[in-house]
A protein has these predicted regions:
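Short, acidic Ser/Thr/Gly-rich low-complexity loop/linker segments typical of extracellular
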Residues: 70-85, 511-512, 518-519
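Zn2+-dependent metallopeptidase catalytic core
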Residues: 89, 111, 147-191
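Glycine-centered loop-to-beta-strand initiation motif
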Residues: 36, 66, 76-101, 468, ...
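Active-site recognition of the HExxH zinc-binding catalytic motif
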Residues: 236-252, 274-278, 282
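C-terminal edge strands of extracellular/lumenal beta-sandwich accessory domains
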Residues: 429-438, 468-473, 499-510, 514, ...
Length: 571
């Protein structure tokens, strides 16, 4: 996307549209002031229309670094204010200088942050916007710089200078929102990796990033391929990924990731994580309509109004559905009223917690819970912190077919979705609790890994009930033996795998291959055993039939319903 000025070794290559003027001369002396405004083109994303270049607006570049250069050396540096203005005082008079804007937001002290936009196909070079050299003369000077979109009317015909600053503008809004809840926040450094060469292709070649995404070890990757998929003006997409960054930096996510669609019945960890990103995007942008543009000329778009009650169009509302959860999260935050069609009961959202309580729950209970991250510990934290709001919170959860949340484990839930394979009655015999409970020294029978919630769009691997959760409490610390053994009948040789979760401590994984003796006729030989050292407290065991977490087109696709007996013993 932006082939604007990538800064390598402090050399700026991106030229900006600049304007200059001189004011009345200062009192006799040897210095003048240089000031101005930094702006960029923002192309609006419109639901149903994509990017509408005819409605491009000029926006101030807020909080970005501005440098004053003399002979390519930086002689002064400052930051633009909330209106994009900057100012340098005591600049040598009658001197040739230039202005350069770095695509970064930096602040030291408390609060602090470091956000940068770099070109991931050009050595991680920082994008910059460079103005022409001018002479300071003997009077105060105004020098404005503008980053243009590069759109030529039917295609991009010039450097896409505005893109990095449009990206940073979303980060600015996100930071300001967080600061309303936690004014002294220290944000970990983050890089946005954007390039016109970033294509929506999964591969190993430069720019083949697949899709816009947050990766903890890298930062945020954003597509920029014109006529395919560009995200620099998709404010919700950028803010969604910032939501994942905040989740990683200040909260916790146990999400297993993978493909997902709004109507899918997902693993609850994935459902909450994606819902959080989308709801945060609506909060940070102040726009409840999430928009993602793509296609030839960027004229196509996907959009969803997170303010609406999803059960109007969503066939699968519940604690496992990202559309339900994104609406719930936004309704907890906002002051809007959801008005379904006249054929549906009126749901009035009279709760407006604002961002402070949302952030508090997100960064405390959601981070430290011994349960897995999902809607349950989040809502439980809100209910505990705000007992007077419990009835209104419960109204919102029940409107999404989520029973009143009474703990972090989803105790008392009655909605287990709509299976896509077997009947609901059949599935309910195997799956009727969010977590199963067991005692150390006992055997929990018939914990079933299912593929009954497979999606026609996104497959089976991360869907509801493919992975099952068992909670148990350790009172005598030390080495324990965990055994998961298949039981008849099985459709194929089973391969149970186990993940042990200990809150925000590192998880333990046991994924041994099935023994040669494991067969349909000998299911008890299909076993996974490991012996971790456990501390006192609550633990969660995640278990699954390995193939039920594979894609439908995998060489070893899901074998479907596979049940296990589970034991945890202390020698």
């Amino acid at each position: 996307m932006l082939r604007l000025c990538v800064c390598i070794s402090l050399i700026a290559l991106l030229a900006g549209c600049g304007g200059g003027s001189s004011s009345a001369a200062p009192a006799p002396g040897t210095t003048v002031a240089v000031s101005g405004q930094i702006t960029f083109d923002r192309v609006p994303a419109v639901a149903g229309q994509g990017l509408v270049y005819a409605q491009t607006v000029v926006q101030p570049a807020r909080g970005v670094t501005v440098e004053l250069l003399q002979s390519d050396s930086v002689i002064a540096s400052t930051t633009t204010d909330a209106t994009g203005n900057y100012s340098f005082g005591n600049v040598p008079a009658s001197t040739d200088v230039s202005i350069r804007v770095r695509a970064e937001m930096l602040r030291v002290g408390t609060p602090s942050w470091s956000f940068r936009v770099v070109d991931n196909v050009n050595g991680e070079a920082l994008y910059t916007l460079a103005g022409a050299v001018f002479n300071t003369g003997t009077a105060n000077v105004t020098r404005n710089l503008h980053a243009a979109s590069g759109w030529g009317g039917a295609a991009y015909t010039a450097t896409r200078s505005a893109a990095p600053f449009a990206i940073l503008d979303v980060a600015y809004d996100a930071v300001q929102l967080v600061l309303t809840a936690q004014p002294l926040t220290v944000f970990p450094a983050l890089r946005f990796h954007w390039s016109p060469a970033n294509v929506p292709v999964d591969g190993t070649a430069p720019g083949e990033i697949g899709s816009s995404q947050f990766k903890p070890s890298i930062g945020i990757l954003l597509v920029g391929a014109a006529d395919q998929d560009t995200d620099e003006y998709d404010r919700h997409v950028i803010a969604h990924e910032l939501g994942h960054y905040l989740e990683y930096a200040f909260s916790r996510s146990d999400s297993i990731g993978g493909p997902h669609a709004l109507s899918d019945q997902l693993d609850m960890r994935l459902a909450f994580g994606e819902a959080w990103g989308t709801a945060f995007a609506a909060m940070a942008t102040g726009d409840a309509v999430y928009k993602d543009t793509f296609g030839a000329g960027q004229r196509q778009s996907f959009s969803v109004d997170v303010e609406q009650r999803p059960s109007r169009t969503n066939p699968n509302p519940g604690w496992f559905n990202e559309e339900s959860l994104q609406s719930l999260l936004f309704d907890l935050y906002d002051h809007g009223r959801d008005v379904p069609p006249t054929t549906a009961p009126l749901i009035v959202d009279d709760l407006a917690l604002g961002f402070g309580p949302i952030w508090q729950a997100f960064t405390t209970e959601q981070r430290t819970t011994r349960a897995l991250t999902s809607v349950f510990p989040f809502v439980d934290a809100l209910r505990v912190a705000r007992p007077g709001d419990q009835p209104l919170i419960d109204n919102l959860t029940t409107s999404q077919r989520i029973a009143a949340v009474t703990d972090a484990y989803g105790t008392g839930q009655t909605n287990f979705g709509l299976p896509t394979k077997r009947t609901l009655l059949e599935v309910s015999q195997d799956f009727n609790t969010v977590y199963s409970s067991m005692a150390v020294g006992a055997t929990l029978q018939n914990v079933c890994s299912l593929d009954d919630y497979t999606s026609a769009l996104t497959g089976a691997e991360n869907k509801l009930a493919s992975r099952r959760f068992v909670r148990f409490t350790v009172t005598n610390p030390g080495q324990h033996t965990i055994t998961v053994r298949a039981r008849a009948p099985i459709n194929a040789p089973a391969d149970p795998d186990v993940v042990l979760h200990r809150g925000n401590e590192p998880r333990l994984v046991s994924e041994d291959a099935a023994a040669p003796s494991c067969a349909i006729s000998t299911p008890t030989a299909c076993v996974e055993t490991f012996s971790p050292t456990l501390s006192v407290g609550e633990h969660v065991l995640e278990l699954y039939e390995w193939t039920n977490t594979n894609a439908l087109d995998d060489a070893e696709p899901p074998i479907g319903r596979t049940c296990f007996d589970v034991t945890v013993t202390r020698p």
